[in-house]
Amino acid sequence: MFCWLSRLCGELSTPTRRTTQLIWSSAARSMVLSSQRIPELSSFVARTNTCGELRSSHLGQEVTLCGWIQFRRQNIFLVLRDFHGLVQVVIPQDESAASVKKILCEAPMESVVQVSGTVISRPPGQKNPKMPTGEIEIKVKTAKLLNSCKKLPFEIKDFMKKTETLRLQYRYLDLRSVQMQYNLRLRSQMVMKMREYLCNLHGFVDVETPTLFKRTPGGAKEFVIPSREPGKFYSLPQSPQQFKQLLMVGGLDRYFQVARCYRDEGSRPDRQPEFTQIDIEMSFVDQTGVQSLIEGLLQYSWPSDKDPLVVPFPSMPFAEALASYGTDKPDTRFGMKIVDISDMFRNTEVGFLQDALSKPQGTVKAICIRKGAKYLKRKDIESIRKFAADHFNEEVLPIFLKTNENWNSPVAKFIMEEQGLGLVKLLETQEEDVVLLTAGEHKKACSLMGKLRLECADLLEARGVVLRDPALFSFLWVVDFPLFLPKEENPQELESAHHPFTAPHPSDIHLLYTEPHKVRSQHYDLVLNGNEIGGGSIRIHNSELQHCVLDTVLKEDVKLLSHLLQALDYGAPPHGGIALGLDRLMCLVTGAPSIRDVIAFPKSFRGHDLMSNAPDSIPPEELKPYHIQVSWPMDAETEKSSSNHPCRSES
C-alpha cells in the first residue's frame, strides 16, 4: 500500500502520508483477534469472503466482497473495509469497464459497495508486510453500489479527533471505527469464553431473572416503573441479588447470568444508569471457592494477545488497604505507600500535629515521592496543599530532601536529629525526595493521603515518569471489610457496608448483638489497577440471623423482604457468589478512556441517550392509564404567587 502510494503520488505531503499509514496500522490492529474467529464468516450472505481474510493462498480465485469505501486515490485504487479488515481494490481503466469505474469513482466515501473480481498478486516492490492482505489486491470485474453515503458529520478514522457528544449523537457511525469494532468484538469473545468456562466446564446454569421487581431497602437508588394499578410501582433491579439467592433455595446449585442492572445515580461520569455484570451464585461454597472460580474464569477468558494471568491473585485485608493506600481499591502497580509516623511526633512542638495526636485515633501520615524535588514544581506542591484544604479541611506539609541530612521544610527546625534519622530510615528517603505529611483522624488522614498518592502519580507521569505500566494488570482481592458503617447523616445509626444479605465473619457473630460496628463481613472485592471490577460475599442463609440484621441492626422494614425471609426458612443451603462489572473490566482490558467506549449504545454522563433524545416527555393521555400526572417544578416566587392566587382551590 505504502509503495503504490509512493509510486502514484510522490508529491504527497508528510501529514498526508502519515494519515494514510495510520489508516493501515489501525486496520492491522483489528486483526489481533482474527486467529480466534470461527470460520464460515461469509455463510448465508452475498459475499464469498471478507475483506480481511484474503491472502496469497487465494491467488486466482474469483471473489465477491461487500464493504465500505474507506480510501480512494487518483481513481485507480480504493481501499474496501468490512468488520474483518481492509483490502486494496484495483479500479479497471479500460473502456469496456466504464460502468464499473463510474460506480467506484463517483461513490462517496463510506458508501457501501459490492465488488466481484480476481485475487491477484501486487506488483514487485508494492507489497505491504504490515498489512494482513498486503500481498494481494482485487482486480475488479463487476461492481454494485448498495447504498450511497451522505456527507458525514465526522471522518470514520480513529486518529481523527471527535467530541464525545458528536460520537454519541451519531453512535451508529462511531461504531464503524477500528477501536469500537475491536472493543465490542473482544467483549463478545470474552463473554463467550466465560459462558464456556462456567457452563461447559463447571456445570453452571444460565438463568434469566426478572427485570420488573419491587423496591428493596438499602443500596443504590432504583428506577421506578409505573403500573396500571393506582399508586403501585415496579422498580428495575440494581442487581439480581435476591433472585439468585432464591435460585439457591430452589436447588439450582450453580447459577450465572450476563445480567442487565439499573441504578438511578444521577450525573456521574464514570457510571451508567444501565450496565452489565457477570452474575454468579453457588451453593455449599466458601470465600476461597468463589475466589478460585473467578481466578480460573478470568484466566480462561483472558485475551490471547495479552500476557497470561498468574493465579492465585494476592489478597489484602481492608484495614491494610486503607492504612497503606488510603482506599479500599488500591492500585498496586506502584509504591508510594502511606506510612504511619505518629510515634516520631509524640512530643512535637508543631501545633496541628499536636492537636491531631491529642484526639482519639489521631495520627500522623506521610508518603515519600521519589525524586519529587526533581519533577514537582512549587506550584504543584501548592496545588496539592490547596486540594487537601478544600476537600478534606486538612493541612499538608511538604519536606524537601536536599540530602539525607538537609531538610527543607517549615517543620525542619522542630525535627531533632534523632527524629530525622528515624524518618529517613522509616520512609527510606533519598536525595531529591519529597515527603508529604498530614495529621488527623486515622481514616480521614489515610483517605487524604490516598488521594494525594494518586494525584502525585498523575503529576509525575505528566513529567514523563512511568509509574503505572498500562500493559500490567495487577489484580488484588480485598477482604475483611466491616459489615456495617455509620450513616453519614446520622453516625449513631448503622447501614450495610455493601448489602444487608452479607454474612458476618464467623469469629464476629457474637458481636452482632452488642458491638455491631466491630463485626467483619464475609465480603470480598476484586480490584484491578485501582478499580473495583467485582464484589461478592457469602450470604446469610439463616432466616433468624437475616431478620436480626434487617430489623435490629439496620432498622429496616422487614415486610419488604418477607418473601426472602420466608424462603430462608425452607431449607436454604449455605451459598455465596459474586458479580463482575463487565463494562469496567472491558474498559481496563482494552485501555479505553471511558466505559462508554466498550458499550455499544451508552448514555451520556448525565444519563441521556443523545442519539434518540431519551428520556423524553409522554403526552398526558398516555400517562392516564398509569394514574400519573406530571407536576412541573416552580421557582419559589412562582410557587408563592400560585399559592396566594384567589382562584386556587384546595383539594
From Swiss-Prot:
UniProt entry tagged with the keyword Nucleotide-binding: yes
Enzyme class: ligase
Predominant cellular place of this UniProt entry's protein: mitochondrion
GO cellular component: mitochondrial matrix; mitochondrial membrane; mitochondrion
Annotated GO MF terms: aspartate-tRNA ligase activity; ATP binding; nucleic acid binding
Record-listed N6-acetyllysine modification sites: 379
Compartments, record wording: Mitochondrion matrix; Mitochondrion membrane
Catalytic reaction(s) noted: tRNA(Asp) + L-aspartate + ATP = L-aspartyl-tRNA(Asp) + AMP + diphosphate
Organelle targeting sequence: 1-44
Keyword Cell inner membrane: no
Protein residues bound to ATP: 263-265, 532, 581-584
Signal peptide feature range: none
Positions of post-translational Phosphothreonine modification: 216
EC numbers for this chain: 6.1.1.12
CDD domains: AspRS_core, EcAspRS_like_N
NCBIfam families hit by this protein: aspS_bact, PRK00476.1
Subunit-structure text: Homodimer.
Role according to the record: Catalyzes the attachment of aspartate to tRNA(Asp) in a two-step reaction: aspartate is first activated by ATP to form Asp-AMP and then transferred to the acceptor end of tRNA(Asp).
Family listed: Belongs to the class-II aminoacyl-tRNA synthetase family. Type 1 subfamily.
Name of the protein: Aspartate--tRNA ligase, mitochondrial
Organism expressing this protein natively: Bos taurus (Bovine)
Gene: DARS2
